[in-house]
């Protein structure tokens, strides 16, 4: 199982053509917190949480990267984009590459983002979302479709699953810093290239796209870093760094 997860994560880092599965094109700039992490190509997503900081997944770590904000069509300059380099990239101190626990990192920008209708921050949680809450995951990851235009930001509505359903899907692998969201019957999921991107529930960042067994497979929903559990570290780091 570990090797399968490792392959998925490698795909998340290196696959340029990877998109959301079973979703739809987001309304343009409706996910204005969504960013693309770029090192000459899109390799992961992220979320703007203040004018100076982006949240992403720790497994997306690169010591230097460029953050692209205000994107919709990732291969077309639409005049709404902002490109800002990282000044610091900080993984959670207890991140484990073995079991992908505490899969969260912060990126400090070299200059503040200009907040406008195309670029704005998403709120951090003050409490965890309840089971069955409907959320939106977005990204430029693998659509596994010949129809969907994955160069345009894709969205997917999906419910938070119970801890029991999540643990049953991945026995012995789910920690308190993870949750599952999606459909046990399969067919809809985040996928490679979506890693690090947002799961937003009622306007609040509750999840970071982390890992899973394949994409959109039956009884194997997507697994996400649980931001409500990790938000203390996020807030402390932003305040003190």
From Swiss-Prot:
Q: Does the keyword NAD apply?
A: no
Proregion residues excised on maturation: 14-19
Q: Which EC number applies?
A: 3.4.21.4
Sorted UniProt keywords: Digestion, Disulfide bond, Hydrolase, Protease, Secreted, Serine protease, Signal, Zymogen
| Substrates-to-products reaction catalysed | Preferential cleavage: Arg-|-Xaa, Lys-|-Xaa
Q: What class of enzyme is it?
A: hydrolase
Q: Does the keyword Cell wall biogenesis/degradation apply?
A: no
Q: Report what the protein is called.
A: Trypsin-1
